[in-house]
Amino acid sequence: MSRAKLEAIRAAKPAVLPSLLLCDFGDLKGELERLTAAGAEALHLDVMDGNFVPNLTYGMPIVEGLRRHSGLPLDVHLMIQDPLSYAGPMVDAGADLLTFHAEAVDDVAEVAGKIRDLGVGVGVALNPDTPLSAIEPALPSVDLVLVMSVDAGFGGQSFNPVALEKLAQLRSRFPKVLLEIDGGIGDQTIGPARQAGADLFVVGSAIFRKPDYGEAFTSLGRALEAADRGATDQGGEVTTGQIASGADPGSTSEDQRQ
């Protein structure tokens, strides 16, 4: 079933994936209903262990609860030091796609292969300062590459335009791999990320800090449509300098709870 959900994600691209890190956990079922009504086609979950990154978030019970109440694909981002120790339990809980960090493991190809053997989609993530060469051994075995546009697990960061360069290189070399971007994605940054080659866009505050999730999805969708037309939403090009200055943070990882 998980591989079928992966194909659903492929069919939905370009797609906005709300990051549940900023949702109201006191009303998780209500948040799920609102996101589904707004047009979410998959959900992104940032799992942090307090070790690989300083913050601590949620684990298998949240994934299991979401699975009971939703058929949406669950995209689980493992920001943890030992991803293989949690991979099986996460799959049992209902994860459809598991992404681990290249910086957390010694052998990216081995870890990717073991996760794939669990019958789910597999992704590999890299932080802004990590070179693409660090993930190359895993690329034949992964379905997705997650390009971080902020450092995983640290707050108060602006969108790092080096992510756009990595996306462009990956798209040129690996046209069939799903490319996902996470960190500082909002109305101003989603277009350049799309033009650089991203398929999936993890969005936090640009959704959850808006009173109407449907309007947030509509605005982000318009920016994606403009990017696909080779234009920008407001008739002018958004430069990497503007992005680097922190315009429209709309972040997920940069707003992680301390």
Feature names for model-found ranges:
Residues S85-P89, A95-R173, L178:
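Conserved anion-binding
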Residues L56-V76, K114-G123, A163-L179, L220-A227:
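Alpha-helix-loop-beta-strand connector modules within alpha/beta enzyme cores
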Residues L43-M60, V150-G156:
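Glycine-rich, proline-tolerant flexible connector loops at the mouths of alpha/beta enzymes
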Residues R194, R209-G230:
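C-terminal helical cap(s) of enzyme catalytic domains, especially alpha/beta-barrels
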Residues L28, D46, M90, V145, ...:
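Conserved, mostly hydrophobic/aromatic
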Residues A38, H69, A93, L118, ...:
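Structural motif
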Residues V16-L20, L43-L45, L74-L78, L98-F100, ...:
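Hydrophobic faces of well-ordered beta-strands that scaffold small-molecule active sites
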Residues M1-L22, K29:
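N-terminal amphipathic alpha-helix/helix-capping segment at the start of soluble metabolic enzymes
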